[in-house]
Amino acid sequence: MLFSGFGSKKPFWDLDENGKRVKKGGYTFVVNRDIPNEKKTVDRLHDAKKVELRLKNTMREELKKGRGGKFKKHMKHFIETQHRFFEMPLKNAGFYGLNKPKNVHKTNKPPIGKDKNLRPSYRVVMLTIRNSNGTVESCTKFLKLLIHELSHTLANHVTWREDDHGKDFKECESFMWKILRKK
């Protein structure tokens, strides 16, 4: 495992979660402190929450209809998983997005993917919202990033692997787009 500098035992991918907490629509989001376009940033994180809820509702409907094929376990897992949305920290080790499983533990739930019975208590999803100029990214670019990061949840990726975007991930990401396009 790679570690950050200065003698820290903290892995390089374990990014800072100490931003400014802002509430909107009954949810709390975390943004960088003293940022331009804070309202737009919070709106974008709120949009992420709405997309997550839409995905979960569509998955529930698909499961009620007996659909889902090989993704039934994945969908149940995704529905049960709580996501907290954060703006990507300015010092981000080169990441554009990051899905951080928190409090990972072994369960008796059906195995899913490479991490089998491991599950997080919740996930922190960090998303780049503004480009280096401080301008909010386009909706299209943001949605692609969001679906990409949420696909790690669907695939049940809970342990760090370098470039964890293999066949299982690609299938999950494709399935997420299919679910999003329903309705």
Where does each model-flagged region fall?
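Walker B catalytic acidic pair
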Residues: 149
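Active-site-proximal or metal-binding-adjacent scaffold patches in catalytic folds
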Residues: 1-144, 153-183
